[in-house]
Structure formats: C-alpha cells, structure tokens
Regions:
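Short, intrinsically disordered, charge-balanced linker/junction segments flanking boundaries
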Residues: 2-4, 8-11, 169, 201, ...
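Conserved SAM/AdoMet-binding glycine-rich loop
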Residues: 99-217, 222-225
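Acidic, low-complexity intrinsically disordered segments
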Residues: 1-105, 111-112
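Donor nucleotide-sugar recognition loop
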Residues: 78, 91-97, 192-198, 229-230
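Short, low-complexity, polar/charged sequence segments that are solvent-exposed and flexible
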Residues: 18-19, 90-91, 138-139, 170-173, ...
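Phosphate/oxyanion-binding loops and surfaces in catalytic or ligand/nucleic-acid-binding neighborhoods
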Residues: 14-18, 126, 241
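Catalytic cores of alpha/beta
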Residues: 164, 226-239
Length: 241
C-alpha cells in the first residue's frame, strides 16, 4: 500500500515490516496503519539495461511494437469516488515523479524501439493544480525529441486548459480514458466524484479543437447508487452531444 519499493526491499533483506502500510498474511490488521500517508520517495528511472541483463526476454517482449509500455509520472489520487480503491492502494497524497527521471525512462524505451507509452497514473491530471506539472512534463518530452510516439492515459477531462490540450495533441496523445460513470449529475454527486458533466464535455470539445481525432474510451457504470430508468438514458444523450 503506497510505495511498494521500500516494502519489497525490506522483504528481500528479511527486515521488519512493523511500520509499513501493508497487510501481512496470518496476522491481524493493525489499527489505523492503513490510513497513514505513505512516505514520499523520489522515483528514479527504471534501468532497462540492467533489466535486460537479468531478463533476456525483454527485447522479445518489446519486438511487436504495437502496444503501450507503462511509465508512471505520479502516484496517489486526491478524490473521494465511492467505488474506487486508488486512495487506499496509493493514498490521497499526490507524489510527482521528477520530470527528468520520467523522460529518462521514456528515452531508454524509445531507444529500444518503443513508440507507445501508457502513463499508469491513477489520474494523469488529478486536479487543476497539477495542470502546470502536466505541461512541464509534455514540454520536456518535446524537448527530448521523442518524435513519432503515441501515448495514452486515464484523465479527468475537467482538468484541462487550451494550452495543455494543445500540448497533449502535439506530443502524440492517441487515446485517453475518462470515467464519466453516469450521465446524471445527481448520481455523479452521490458517488462523490467531484466534477461537472458540462465541464467534461467542454474539455472534450477543447481537445477536438486542438486537433485530437483519435480514440476515447468512456467508462459508464450501470446500476450505481439510486440508478433509475431515466438516469440510465442520460449517458446516451450526453454522448450524442
């Protein structure tokens, strides 16, 4: 739970897990520990040369080239969606990975022929205060000369502005997922999702105006809290708009 790297290191070294945010098989849950904020540690780039040295099949895995390879730019999600476990798994505190380390990891993969990247964050833009951080990363990707790439992410489409939309298109965003979950603003509020459906639609139009013409995956859920026949019909009206 939270940062897995120090936990794995302690397991390998046979050290105590007394202070770690984790469940241990065969032991009763420790009261309160699961809700503590994870310790923030700077994330360094994966060393793919080392990975290749201990896993000879790495290049075989990358040969097809028609898929996305995961790269993480941040951890944590500040939201309270009632159905989601990310706030338990990663914590609500957002921890940004250093931009230069993210780009260095992408450069290693790029030099190995990878052109598809999936940003594995719980949310690529978790809140409006992280818009500038997303811009900084995308500008760094451009400056690194990672041309011809395609990237994808799960985003909250209410956290966009025109400049960010333009950068997303220019750097190769080819696919994104948004979780509208319901076309009913009433049910969105009841699920504590914290966004306005009209703002989401306006942001999608903003991306289209910036030149985005690729794939969008819209996640809907049926039979959510207080679902009714009239609320089930609303997503299709939203899609038509």
């Amino acid at each position: 739970v939270g940062e897995g790297e120090p936990l794995l290191e302690k397991l390998l070294l046979g050290q105590s897990l007394e202070g770690e945010r984790c469940f241990q098989v065969g032991e009763p849950p420790r009261s309160g520990l699961i809700h503590e904020q994870p310790e923030s540690r700077p994330k360094t780039a994966c060393d793919y040369s080392y990975i290749a040295s201990i896993w000879p099949q790495l290049d075989w895995y990358l040969e097809a080239g028609d898929f996305y390879v995961g790269v993480q730019t941040k951890r944590g999600c500040p939201h309270n969606c009632c159905y989601c476990i990310y706030t338990v798994v990663e914590g609500k505190q957002v921890r940004l990975n250093p931009v230069d380390e993210v780009v260095a990891e992408m450069r290693q993969l790029y030099d190995r022929g990878v052109r598809g990247f999936w940003f594995t964050d719980a949310q690529f833009i978790p809140a409006r205060r992280y818009i500038e951080d997303a811009k900084e990363l995308l500008r760094a990707i451009k400056a690194e000369g990672l041309t011809g790439i395609r990237w994808a992410a799960y985003i909250r489409a209410d956290n966009l502005d025109p400049e960010l939309a333009q950068l997303m298109v220019e750097t190769g965003m080819s696919y994104f997922e948004i979780g509208i979950t319901s076309g009913s603003q009433e049910l969105v509020r009841k699920m504590r999702m914290g966004y306005n459906l009209r703002t989401v639609l306006e942001s999608c139009r903003m991306l289209a105006e910036a030149g985005f013409k690729d794939h969008v995956s819209v996640n809907y859920s049926f039979n959510v809290i207080d679902e009714r026949p009239e609320t089930i019909a609303k997503p299709w009206r939203i899609t038509e708009n």
